[in-house]
Amino acid sequence: MSEEVSAPARLLFNRWDTSEVTIRDPGIARYVNLNSMMVPHSCGRLTRQEFHKANMLIVERLINQLMRTEVNTGKKQLAIRIVRDAFEIVHQKTKKNPIEVLCDAVANAGPREETVRLKYGGINVPKSVDTAPMRRVNTAVGLIAAGVYSASHKKKKPVANALAEELIAAANGDVKCYSVAKREERERVAKSAR
């Protein structure tokens, strides 16, 4: 009788299992991709069409946002190493799967309400609108990356430590972290424009 051999699961960075991660926010669950891959590098396959970045692994989207600063521009291997080291720090501090911490951070850092400018006879009037789920995810990842950059640029704190602290604080909903503070600010402005 032959034994069935199941294919080994592909773990992110050969360590983290994405299948055990649950996304608690149902609004963004469709746009946070958790397909398993060893190295989060899609080689630009998902950038040619408009909404295909929803199919990109959320970790790779974070890596791509970290590459946008002038120090890390185009250095994907450096950004991958930063995220891998930050995930190790997150796991040491929280004893949780860091991908789940990242998903919670994205859910807590994305603004639910924003403002747009409407022009009435030469006068700009702010109007509050609900944020689309894909924009929530994009904005959250961008705010997390901006918070990491502001916490580590021209400072002695390593980038991996800054990313780990930002992810943990955003996952807990701490208003002292950059991304959640910016989300609160945007929602406060939107609330005043209702």
From Swiss-Prot:
GO BP of this protein: translation
Any Gene Ontology CC annotation: small ribosomal subunit
GO MF entry, a single one: rRNA binding
Tell me the InterPro entries matching this sequence: Ribosomal_uS7, Ribosomal_uS7_arc, Ribosomal_uS7_CS, Ribosomal_uS7_dom, Ribosomal_uS7_dom_sf, Ribosomal_uS7_euk/arc
> What's the domain of life for this entry?
Archaea
Alphabetized PROSITE patterns for the sequence: RIBOSOMAL_S7
Q: Mind telling me what this protein is named?
A: Small ribosomal subunit protein uS7
The species is Methanospirillum hungatei JF-1 (strain ATCC 27890 / DSM 864 / NBRC 100397 / JF-1)
